[in-house]
């Protein structure tokens, strides 16, 4: 995907546990906490009222009165992750409370300093990332019940009501559907090392089924997310301050830096799932798309980024299949690539509905109950990309990866 990575092939068997990837939940954080220690009650009290405070244009005033708290009393990974989730939501709400016409240019030190501190502890940037919005931001209503949307709720929220909850929780279910695929690519990588062609074939078949299940689950967006609400009411709170015309200079983190800092907004490209699939299948994207995707890895938990890099460093699946001369392996590989291309085509139809069509509709008059839709990113993803050309390029490069028998 990018030229500057060392091309060292590893022969060490992979295991999910060593990358803090759950056997049951994949990249989702199992047993996310809902409360921080009492010392951080000032954060939680505001975070739990976030939608109401933003709607009343009172969030900035409440944040400005917050005490400056150190992160030293956060114990363990889950408390750190919840703190990052809470502070990221406070930050996005603070910056975008008045919409894109009046974004906050300075993040006050009582929010900026602890946010940067916990971000450094976790190896994450000080902005809302996919890890916050989705991977950490879910809990079961009934702990013994199934992982399905009726039994899930978010921990922290923005304005957007049920559509916002649906967007987050359907995305969490997509991550859950990826778990068999993540396990399959580990099994396949280890099968190449053994080598065991039968185990490799079975793993490729499981990967294809997982990708197809991801596509089906993504379709639940239609049931739970209203396009008008997503476009005009939710999307702005996922927007960053890099490649965003509404904030060309970036955001000043008071007490952290003398210059404004620039970070990309939340993006599906920050999900580790498709990066891992691409590396395993040997899919190479165009320089522009590849550079953006590679940069998004810095917005992932470091252990998840390391997983992608180790998949990249593993022996090449494509080379192994071509050298094996086994048509059934080549067919199974191509079915995985085809399924991935179909997933990406479906994603394009979703973006067309929730971004392109919704933007055109908003241009001709917004519903009275929604704020004015953001214009600065009207044809761009919240990560700052020219979204349709990016998605089509990624889909087309996936299709170009179809293998043909040698000879």
Curated annotation (Swiss-Prot):
Gene Ontology MF: a single term: tryptophan 2,3-dioxygenase activity
Going by the record, the broad EC class of this enzyme is oxidoreductase
The protein's UniProt keywords, in alphabetical order, are: Dioxygenase, Heme, Immunity, Iron, Metal-binding, Oxidoreductase, Tryptophan catabolism
Which reaction is catalysed here? L-tryptophan + O2 = N-formyl-L-kynurenine
Give all cystine bridges in this chain: none
Hey, what's the signal peptide range on this chain? none
Query: Which pathway?
Result: Amino-acid degradation; L-tryptophan degradation via kynurenine pathway; L-kynurenine from L-tryptophan: step 1/2
InterPro entries from the UniProt entry: Indolamine_dOase, Trp/Indoleamine_2_3_dOase-like
Miscellaneous: IDO1 and IDO2 are 2 distinct enzymes which catalyze the same reaction. IDO2 affinity for tryptophan is much lower than that of IDO1. 50 % of Caucasians harbor polymorphisms which abolish IDO2 enzymatic activity. IDO2 is expressed in human tumors in an inactive form: tryptophan degradation is entirely provided by IDO1 in these cells. IDO2 may play a role as a negative regulator of IDO1 by competing for heme-binding with IDO1. Low efficiency IDO2 enzymes have been conserved throughout vertebrate evolution, whereas higher efficiency IDO1 enzymes are dispensable in many lower vertebrate lineages.
Indicate the family of this protein. Answer: Belongs to the indoleamine 2,3-dioxygenase family.
* Protein name, entry field: Indoleamine 2,3-dioxygenase 2
């Amino acid at each position: 995907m990018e030229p500057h990575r060392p091309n060292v092939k590893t022969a060490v068997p992979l295991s999910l546990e060593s990358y803090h990837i759950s056997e049951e939940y994949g990249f989702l954080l199992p047993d996310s906490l809902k409360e921080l220690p009492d010392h951080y009650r000032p954060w939680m009290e505001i975070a739990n009222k976030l939608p109401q405070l933003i709607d009343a244009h009172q969030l900035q005033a409440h944040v400005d009165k917050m005490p400056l708290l150190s992160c030293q009393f956060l114990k363990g990974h889950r408390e750190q992750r919840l703190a990052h989730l809470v502070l990221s939501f406070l930050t996005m709400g603070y910056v975008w409370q008045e919409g894109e016409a009046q974004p906050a240019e300075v993040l006050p030190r009582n929010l900026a300093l602890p946010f940067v501190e916990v971000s450094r502890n976790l190896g994450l940037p000080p902005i809302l990332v996919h890890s916050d919005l989705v991977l950490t931001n879910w809990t079961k209503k009934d702990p013994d019940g199934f992982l399905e949307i009726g039994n899930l709720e978010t921990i922290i929220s923005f304005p957007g009501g049920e559509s916002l909850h649906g967007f987050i929780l359907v995305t969490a279910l997509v991550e859950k559907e990826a778990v068999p695929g993540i396990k399959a690519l580990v099994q396949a990588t280890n099968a190449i090392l053994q080598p065991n062609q039968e185990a490799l074939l079975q793993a490729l078949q499981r990967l294809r089924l997982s990708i197809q299940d991801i596509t089906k689950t993504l379709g639940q967006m239609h049931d739970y997310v209203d396009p008008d609400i997503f476009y005009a009411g939710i999307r702005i709170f996922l927007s960053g301050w890099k490649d965003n015309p509404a904030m060309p200079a970036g955001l000043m983190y008071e007490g952290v830096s003398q210059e404004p800092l620039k970070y990309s907004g939340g993006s599906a490209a920050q999900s580790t799932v498709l990066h891992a699939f691409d590396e395993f299948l040997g899919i190479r994207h165009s320089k522009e798309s590849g550079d953006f995707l590679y940069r998004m890895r810095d917005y992932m938990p470091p252990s998840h980024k390391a997983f992608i890099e180790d998949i990249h460093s593993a022996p090449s699946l494509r080379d192994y299949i071509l050298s094996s001369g086994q048509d059934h392996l080549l067919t199974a590989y191509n079915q995985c690539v085809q399924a991935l291309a179909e997933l990406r085509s479906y994603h394009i139809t979703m973006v067309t509905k929730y971004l392109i069509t919704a933007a055109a509709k908003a241009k001709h008059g917004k519903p009275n109950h929604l704020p004015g839709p953001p214009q600065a990113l009207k044809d761009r993803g919240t990560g700052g990309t020219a979204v349709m050309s990016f998605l089509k390029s990624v889909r087309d490069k996936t299709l170009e990866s179809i293998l043909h028998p040698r000879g």
